């Protein structure tokens, strides 16, 4: 075996340990990275505790992360505590990097959700918790920053029960900024016994039968309830002053359990890619089952591609070590595997967590280099960033030739701009950020362009029928033409032309929620080619779309607004101005809970407005819920070359008939 800074004794200890993969999650500025750094230091993985303010953190390794004090990319490190190896995934806390957060959910055995004792529950907090709850991921809630002035823990406890879950178990009490246990293996309060009985039928039966139940019995039941994501323990601390960190480590090693291995066959999931300063590609994999060995030859996905593992590392106590084998539930690092993409798997297809819906960006902007000769450099850099983060979608507009990037928000745009400048040495300018609208035909229409009928220059006849479909259906393509008459290559060319045409409608936005039927075709055998059909299709499609007209679709958000009762009138007025659809309002003496749908374009900044007018008490949580016909103003995205004389001639020809 080969080792780097690790002995054979350490390695054999490692492969016999229980291994868990833990996500560290939080809203921005809750102290997530600081908590992670304290876990590393307290466990002995680092010799000093990194500080965000000093820019010397282990997990935020990118220069921009250290400078801005936010996490951009999920990073993985490792600690050992109470005989358990814990791979820690420090994830972004900003909504603009939610895609990075979502990817980590696929590999978590448990999570620590960090709240700020001062700021309390934010919109991002509830979004994260709802996902953890939906996927039944065991979760510990850690209330950080209990040292801050003005902290009201009783109000926060009520907020947790109101906005997160009633199934929380407060494990400690806080006195003069210090934490003391009130629930352990040796002691449990009477009210907590009732809590456990209400969540476990076996304990309840023993309790009602006056059978002896020891504190250890209650404790083991709590462990089981947490492992099943039925109960969420709540702990307290201050990363700034290293308060409650050891207790958090104890809770992690007690409550988060490793999964049972179901097979000895290799199954590994690729969740992260990064490039080192020399450009070498580093791929991070979670070994779901079996093991990955040096010099193994393994299949990528279900394809015919095989790769040989020429180098292999894992993470041990905060550092990487070279090994010959990485076992089940551990993290493997493989370098210079060019065929790897995030989301790939090796060996048997893993049973990844189901029910996770990826949020697609609904904003876009054009980007151009300050120096036009550096355009190819920008494209190459964006491609590298896309390999590292597949949610970074960019394309070249087929009409304007502009580079367009889809975005989650302003912060992501600023991060991309800084990365291009500092990492790739190219300065760029972003145009105004736009909402991404879509288009849908209004009515069913049919359009035909005949072969050898001017101004048609192509050796093809094409007839297309367009008809609208229900919102959210997407694009459907059908053909009424027999393959015996027109073979696959010609028909595939038409289908390609349809897909290309749907990229830009009458207002420049993607055309969706429609069925396109290929209804008529004619060709001349000696001269017609698939290219004739491919190139004519967009003109037929465009003319049909003009005849139909289009509805403009705008992205919608499902929202939940939790505010003090005193602010409810203002909130309802605001929601009406934003053209929201209020579906439910429930109020009591203190709080008002409003649910509904609201356009993205009118509600971009409303979360910060809610926080402002409720003095931090209100929560505005949103998630994408598809598109609907817009009720308000919208912007065009027209990029078509106005000098397209052929389209003009087709339009003129059709209008004269």
Curated annotation (Swiss-Prot):
InterPro entries per the UniProt record, alphabetical: EFG_II (IPR041095), EFG_III/V (IPR035647), EFG_V-like (IPR000640), G_TR_CS (IPR031157), P-loop_NTPase (IPR027417), Ribosomal_Su5_D2-typ_SF (IPR020568), Ribsml_uS5_D2-typ_fold_subgr (IPR014721), Small_GTP-bd (IPR005225)
Keywords: Antibiotic resistance, GTP-binding, Nucleotide-binding, Protein biosynthesis
Binding site for GTP: 26-33, 90-94, 144-147
Gene Ontology biological-process annotations: response to antibiotic; ribosome disassembly; translation
Domain tr-type G, residue spans: 17-260
Annotated signal sequence range: none
Family annotation (Pfam families): EFG_C, EFG_III, EFG_IV, GTP_EFTU
SMART domains named in the record: EFG_C, EFG_IV
The organism's place on the tree of life at top rank: Bacteria
GO molecular function: GTP binding; GTPase activity
NCBIfam families: small_GTP, tet_protect, tet_protect_Q
Function: Abolishes the inhibitory effect of tetracycline on protein synthesis by non-covalently modifying ribosomes. Confers mild resistance to tetracycline when expressed in E.coli.
Family the entry assigns: Belongs to the TRAFAC class translation factor GTPase superfamily. Classic translation factor GTPase family. TetM/TetO subfamily.
Identification of the protein by name: Tetracycline resistance protein TetQ
Species whose genome carries this gene: Bacteroides fragilis
Encoding gene, per UniProt annotation: tetQ
């Amino acid at each position: 075996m080969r080792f780097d800074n690790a002995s054979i004794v350490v390695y054999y200890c490692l492969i016999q340990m229980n291994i868990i993969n833990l996500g560290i999650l939080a809203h921005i500025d809750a102290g997530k990275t600081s908590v992670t750094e304290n876990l590393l230091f307290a466990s002995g993985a680092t010799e000093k505790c990194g500080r965000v303010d000093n820019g010397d953190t282990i997990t935020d390794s990118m220069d921009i992360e250290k400078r801005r004090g936010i996490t951009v990319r999920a990073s993985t490190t490792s600690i050992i505590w109470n005989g358990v190896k814990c791979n820690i995934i420090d994830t972004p806390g900003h909504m603009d990097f939610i895609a990075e957060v979502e990817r980590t959910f696929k590999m978590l055995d448990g999570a620590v959700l960090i709240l700020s004792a001062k700021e309390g529950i934010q919109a991002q907090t509830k979004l994260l918790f709802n996902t953890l709850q939906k996927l039944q991921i065991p979760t510990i809630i850690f209330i950080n920053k209990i040292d801050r002035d003005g902290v009201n823990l009783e109000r926060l406890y009520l907020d947790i029960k109101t906005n997160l879950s009633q199934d929380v178990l407060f494990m400690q009490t806080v006195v003069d900024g210090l934490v003391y246990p009130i629930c352990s293996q040796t002691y449990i309060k009477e009210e907590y016994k009732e809590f456990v009985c209400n969540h476990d039928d076996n304990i309840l039966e023993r309790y009602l039968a006056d059978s002896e139940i020891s504190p250890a019995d209650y404790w083991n039941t709590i462990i089981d309830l947490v492992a099943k994501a039925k109960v969420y323990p709540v702990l307290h601390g201050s990363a700034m002053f290293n308060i409650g960190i050891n207790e958090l480590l104890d809770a992690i090693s007690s409550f988060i359990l490793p999964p049972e291995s179901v097979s000895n066959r290799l199954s590994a999931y690729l969740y992260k890619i990064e490039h080192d300063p020399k450009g070498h590609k580093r791929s991070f994999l979670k070994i779901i089952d079996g093991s990955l060995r040096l010099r193994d030859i393994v299949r990528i996905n279900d394809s015919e591609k095989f790769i040989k593992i020429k180098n292999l590392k894992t993470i041990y106590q905060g550092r990487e070590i070279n090994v010959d084998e990485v076992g089940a539930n551990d993290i493997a690092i493989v370098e210079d595997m060019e065929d790897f993409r995030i989301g790939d798997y090796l060996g048997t297809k893993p049973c990844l967590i189901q029910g996770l819906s990826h949020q697609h960006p609904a904003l876009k902007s054009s980007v151009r280099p300050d120096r036009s000769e550096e355009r190819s450099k920008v494209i190459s850099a964006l491609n590298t960033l896309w390999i590292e983060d597949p949610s970074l979608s960019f394309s070249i507009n087929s009409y304007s030739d502009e580079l367009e990037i889809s975005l989650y928000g302003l912060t992501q745009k600023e991060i991309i701009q800084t990365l291009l400048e500092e990492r790739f040495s190219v300065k760029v300018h972003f145009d105004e950020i736009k909402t991404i609208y879509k288009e849908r035909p209004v009515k069913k229409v049919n359009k035909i362009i005949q072969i050898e009928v001017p101004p048609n220059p192509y050796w093809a006849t094409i007839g297309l029928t367009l008809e609208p479909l229900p919102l959210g259906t997407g694009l459907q393509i059908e053909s009424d033409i027999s393959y015996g008459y027109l073979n696959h290559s010609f028909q595939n060319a038409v289908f390609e032309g349809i897909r290309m045409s749907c990229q830009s409608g009458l207002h420049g936005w993607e055309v969706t929620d429609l069925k396109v039927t290929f209804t008529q075709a004619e060709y001349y055998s000696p001269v017609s080619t698939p290219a004739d059909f491919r190139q004519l299709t967009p003109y037929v499609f465009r003319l049909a779309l003009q005849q139909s007209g289009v509805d403009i679709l705008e992205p919608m958000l499902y929202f939940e607004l939790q505010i003090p009762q005193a602010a409810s009138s203002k909130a309802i007025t605001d929601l009406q101005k934003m053209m929201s659809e209020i579906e439910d309002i429930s109020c009591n003496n203190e709080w008002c809970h409003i649910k509904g749908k609201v356009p993205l374009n009118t509600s971009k900044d409303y979360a910060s407005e809610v926080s402002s007018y409720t003095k931090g008490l209100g929560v505005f949580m949103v998630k994408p819920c598809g598109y609907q016909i817009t009720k308000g103003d919208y912007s065009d995205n027209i990029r078509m070359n106005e000098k397209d004389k052929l389209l003009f001639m087709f339009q003129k020809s059709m209008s004269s008939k």
